[in-house]
């Protein structure tokens, strides 16, 4: 599965904000606000990243799901930079 520039932007945002644990994770809304991407783009990207194991679901924030970057996701970023 190919990853595009907008999708890499999401991984970069998670890594730059140290979202690497279940407790330190971002909601879809937070990712949209920081990355300036649409909600549908963020949701589609997160779904792909979950399948690729680049992100995992963190602790819920109220009723909202949160997500953090995994070691696999960090390795993927290192491989392209």
UniProtKB/Swiss-Prot annotation:
<comment type="subunit">
    <text>Monomer; probably dimerizes when bound to DNA. Binds to TubZ when associated with tubC DNA.</text>
</comment>
<dbReference type="GO" id="GO:0030541">
    <property type="term" value="P:plasmid partitioning"/>
</dbReference>
<keyword id="KW-1035">Host cytoplasm</keyword>
<comment type="function">
    <text>A DNA-binding protein that is part of the type III partition system presumably used to ensure correct segregation of this bacteriophage. Binds to tubC (centromere-like site) DNA upstream of its own gene in a sequence-specific fashion (consensus TTGAC); binds to multiple sites in the tubC region, probably spreading from an initial site. Upon binding to tubC forms flexible loops over about 1 kb of DNA that forms 2 rings, covering tubC and the promoter region. This probably shuts off transcription of the operon. DNA is both bent and untwisted by TubR.</text>
</comment>
<dbReference type="GO" id="GO:0030430">
    <property type="term" value="C:host cell cytoplasm"/>
</dbReference>
<dbReference type="InterPro" id="IPR036388">
    <property type="entry name" value="WH-like_DNA-bd_sf"/>
</dbReference>
<dbReference type="InterPro" id="IPR036390">
    <property type="entry name" value="WH_DNA-bd_sf"/>
</dbReference>
<dbReference type="GO" id="GO:0003677">
    <property type="term" value="F:DNA binding"/>
</dbReference>
<protein>
    <recommendedName>
        <fullName>DNA-binding protein TubR</fullName>
    </recommendedName>
</protein>
<keyword id="KW-0238">DNA-binding</keyword>
<keyword id="KW-0616">Plasmid partition</keyword>
């Amino acid at each position: 599965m190919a990853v595009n520039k907008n999708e890499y932007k999401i991984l970069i945002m998670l890594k730059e904000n140290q979202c690497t644990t279940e407790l330190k994770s971002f909601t879809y809304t937070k990712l949209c606000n920081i990355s300036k991407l649409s909600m549908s783009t963020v949701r589609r990207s997160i779904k792909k990243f979950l399948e690729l194991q680049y992100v995992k679901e963190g602790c819920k924030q109220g009723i909202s799901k949160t997500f953090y970057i995994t070691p696999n996701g960090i390795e993927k970023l290192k491989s392209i930079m």
